[in-house]
């Protein structure tokens, strides 16, 4: 297909036009009085949402040159969402403001490369100041405030997230599920859970609930496929039978004949046994089995270590306080040795620092949560499917924002941190930068005012007047758009995670700098 090539101002203008379209759709959701956006669906009900990154992902323009502008600014939102999980609308508004100011200067003859250097220096300075001013989270009340604000001022959600974090710890997993009722509920799963259930329904002990419950069982952990019951399993089964305790077998798989023999012994009441397949695949399976072994104080019977099933002893079996197995999942509640668990968690944290792709990071986070804290499940309740989707997105933002706040602390919310730091940046830039680098830094000074301005305008007031009032007050002062008053943000609980504030600015400036230094745009030529 033929290509359309645009140069200089024409290229930048096309990108700007696309950005204008996207930003207007996203910015109307900003702040406590931000409005909703309805997404039309070819199949199923329309979706009503208030989530910046989801709206940004939906927008596709007919003009492919303008659509490139949409795609670029969408990156600022997506990257912020990946890093901090919230602040996507703020990142979009900031990126747009930087591009708008920057393009005016480029059109007036400024050198985009020097402007970019000024922008980068200014952002580095502001990020340092955000870290300096951020306060660590001191109480569960702070966690509640963060959760409430990020979920659209829903105190009930904030309290629920605070309770979940208190139960599972900051490294625990909080997952979202669609509930069956109209109210949102919190369910805490104790112990380690993995997504493999019993191999055969003949193992079930509670037929009404179709599950297996074992108290104080031994646990045999192996990465082998069990094929020969006489040679491989019989010796250890006899030893376990003498103790009178139940046995859980976690293996790669069990051959039909071996499985049949185990089931017959179970049904005759000779031994209380249940078999499940090992979780995961390949190398990850071995790591998960090692995690289970550490949790249950057992040993993984593997050829790599020179261990075999026929020669194993009771000491090599793990043990647990309680095991609950359904057809889809296994939950092990064990009294593990704290020092061994801590060492394993530290090892996983080091792997997390070195991990590059998001899939590997997610899986490591999952392992860390299972070992260290446990899992909290929030069952989202709503009257309609449309409300359910909106609630899920808000809850997702709230959970991410809360975790970000625990990591890097909190700063005054509602865009007020940016307003206060814009004045600090102005003084620093005038004293430390010259010529076009100074112009680049002053672009950031002006752009930092835009998130608050938009929040105020969405609440139906004059942004410029409020900004002037906040500039002349102390750092914790900001604007409560909900009641339309200037207040102490910490006292009112209007706080943002420092990580979200920082990421929004860094990603916005990164994308905006790239757009400003664009001199040529190549896009598909669309025939009318």
From Swiss-Prot:
Role description: Together with its co-chaperonin GroES, plays an essential role in assisting protein folding. The GroEL-GroES system forms a nano-cage that allows encapsulation of the non-native substrate proteins and provides a physical environment optimized to promote and accelerate protein folding.
Alphabetized Pfam families for the sequence: Cpn60_TCP1
Gene Ontology terms for molecular function: ATP binding; ATP-dependent protein folding chaperone; isomerase activity; unfolded protein binding
Keywords: ATP-binding, Chaperone, Chloroplast, Isomerase, Nucleotide-binding, Plastid
Domain of life: Eukaryota
Subcellular compartments: Plastid, Chloroplast
Name used for this protein in its record: Chaperonin GroEL, chloroplastic
Gene3D superfamilies given in the database record: GroEL (3.50.7.10), GroEL-like equatorial domain (1.10.560.10), TCP-1-like chaperonin intermediate domain (3.30.260.10)
The EC number(s) this enzyme carries: 5.6.1.7
GO CC field: chloroplast
NCBIfam families in alphabetical order: GroEL, PRK00013.1, PRK12849.1, PRK12850.1, PRK12851.1
Similarity comment: family membership: Belongs to the chaperonin (HSP60) family.
This protein's record includes keyword Aminoacyl-tRNA synthetase: no
Annotated organism of origin: Gracilaria tenuistipitata var. liui
Subunit composition and interactions: Forms a cylinder of 14 subunits composed of two heptameric rings stacked back-to-back. Interacts with the co-chaperonin GroES.
Enzyme class: isomerase
Binding residues for ATP: 29-32, 86-90, 414, 496
């Amino acid at each position: 297909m033929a290509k359309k090539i645009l140069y200089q101002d024409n290229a930048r203008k096309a990108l700007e036009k696309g950005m204008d379209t996207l930003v207007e759709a996203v910015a109307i959701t900003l702040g406590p009085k931000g409005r909703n956006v309805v997404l039309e669906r070819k199949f199923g009900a329309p979706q009503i949402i208030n989530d910046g990154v989801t709206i940004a992902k939906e927008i596709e323009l007919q003009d492919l040159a303008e659509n490139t502008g949409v795609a670029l600014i969408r990156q600022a939102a997506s990257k912020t969402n990946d890093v901090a999980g919230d602040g996507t609308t703020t990142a979009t508004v900031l990126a747009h403001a930087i591009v708008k100011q920057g393009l005016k200067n480029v059109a007036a003859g400024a050198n985009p490369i020097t402007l970019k250097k000024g922008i980068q220096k200014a952002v580095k300075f502001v990020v340092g100041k955000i870290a300096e001013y951020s306060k660590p989270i001191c109480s569960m009340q702070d966690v509640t405030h963060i959760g409430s604000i990020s979920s659209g001022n829903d105190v009930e959600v904030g309290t629920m997230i605070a309770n979940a974090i208190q139960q599972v710890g900051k490294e625990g997993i909080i997952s979202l599920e669609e509930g069956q009722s109209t109210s949102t509920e919190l369910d805490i799963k104790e112990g380690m859970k993995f997504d493999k259930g019993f191999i055969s329904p003949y193992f079930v002990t509670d037929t009404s609930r179709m599950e297996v419950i074992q108290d104080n069982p031994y646990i045999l952990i192996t990465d082998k496929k069990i094929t020969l019951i006489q040679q491989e399993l019989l010796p250890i089964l006899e030893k376990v039978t003498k103790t009178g305790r139940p046995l859980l077998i976690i293996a790669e798989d069990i051959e039909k004949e071996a499985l049949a023999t185990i089931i017959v012994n179970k049904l005759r009441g000779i031994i209380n046994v249940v078999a499940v397949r090992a979780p995961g695949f390949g190398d990850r399976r071995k790591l998960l089995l090692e995690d289970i072994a550490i949790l249950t104080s057992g040993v993984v019977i593997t050829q790599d270590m020179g261990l075999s099933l026929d020669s194993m002893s009771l000491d090599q079996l793990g043990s647990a306080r309680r095991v609950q197995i359904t057809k889809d999942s296994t939950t092990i509640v064990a009294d593990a040795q704290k020092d061994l668990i801590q060492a394993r968690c530290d090892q996983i944290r080091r792997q997390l620092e070195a991990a590059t792709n998001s899939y590997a990071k997610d899986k490591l986070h999952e392992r860390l949560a299972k070992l260290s804290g446990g899992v909290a499940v929030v069952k989202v309740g709503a009257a309609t499917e449309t409300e359910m989707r909106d609630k899920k997105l808000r809850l997702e933002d709230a959970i991410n924002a809360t975790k970000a706040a625990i990591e890097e602390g909190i700063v005054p919310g509602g865009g007020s941190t940016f307003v206060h730091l814009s004045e600090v940046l102005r003084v620093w830039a005038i004293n430390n930068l010259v010529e076009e680098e100074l112009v680049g830094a002053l672009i950031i000074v002006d752009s930092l005012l835009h998130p608050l301005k938009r929040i105020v305008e969405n609440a139906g007031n004059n942004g410029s007047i409020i900004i002037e009032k906040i500039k002349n007050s102390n750092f914790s002062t900001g604007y409560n758009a909900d009641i339309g008053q200037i207040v102490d943000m910490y006292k009112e609980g209007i706080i943002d995670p420092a990580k979200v504030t920082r990421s929004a600015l860094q990603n916005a400036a990164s994308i905006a700098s790239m757009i400003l230094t664009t001199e040529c745009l190549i896009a598909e030529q669309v025939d009318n």
